[in-house]
């Protein structure tokens, strides 16, 4: 697939612009697109254990797949890097952001926004929701993460500061007393079902 477009000079923000000390803001929720796809394509299996209302909500996650609104707000606040969270999910996107920028990443699992519907759908198929295709979410690097979150929330877009860029190359997820090193995304969790 090839895409062509026009951008004003000086307005391109790449995945590779993150600097040590930058905060990492994540928009919306982990696993959005994957949850929507699974709920639509595996509805019968999900009905065996989950209520129809939850499945319907999960199918509706497709309404969140555009990242244009948050991109515009991020540009107004000022950012160093932006990366859409697609195949490989949140963990894959964090690794890609760090790799493209030549920095380390420290992110906190308990700060990563996730919907209960995603957790429950993933439990049925034994999937890691943080490694599930998450189109509709963005990772944004900036100096003023809390300001960006505030502006996004004012516009009705869920967002959270989930970590920061560090010196070095370690890309880690901190969960309570555990530290997990992440690497390049392998096959997306969606392909396991």
Where in the sequence are the language-model features?
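Helix-biased detector of long, well-ordered alpha-helical tracts
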Residues: 1-193
């Amino acid at each position: 697939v090839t895409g062509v477009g026009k951008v004003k000079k000086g307005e391109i923000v790449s995945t590779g612009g993150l600097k040590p000390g930058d905060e990492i803001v994540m928009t919306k929720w982990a696993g959005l697109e994957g949850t929507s796809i699974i709920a639509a394509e595996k509805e019968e299996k999900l009905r065996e254990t989950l209520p129809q209302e939850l499945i319907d909500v999960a199918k509706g996650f497709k309404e969140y797949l555009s990242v244009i609104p948050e991109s515009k707000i991020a540009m107004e606040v000022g950012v160093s890097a932006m990366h859409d969270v697609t195949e490989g999910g949140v963990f894959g996107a964090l690794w890609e952001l760090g790799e493209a920028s030549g920095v380390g990443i420290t992110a906190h699992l308990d700060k990563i926004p996730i919907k209960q519907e995603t957790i429950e759908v993933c439990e049925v198929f034994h999937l890691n929701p943080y490694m599930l295709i998450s189109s509709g979410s963005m990772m944004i690097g900036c100096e003023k993460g809390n300001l960006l979150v505030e502006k996004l929330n004012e516009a009705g877009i869920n967002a959270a500061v989930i970590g920061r860029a560090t010196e070095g190359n370690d890309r880690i997820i901190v969960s309570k007393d555990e530290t997990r090193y992440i690497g390049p995304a392998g096959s997306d969790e969606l392909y396991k079902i």
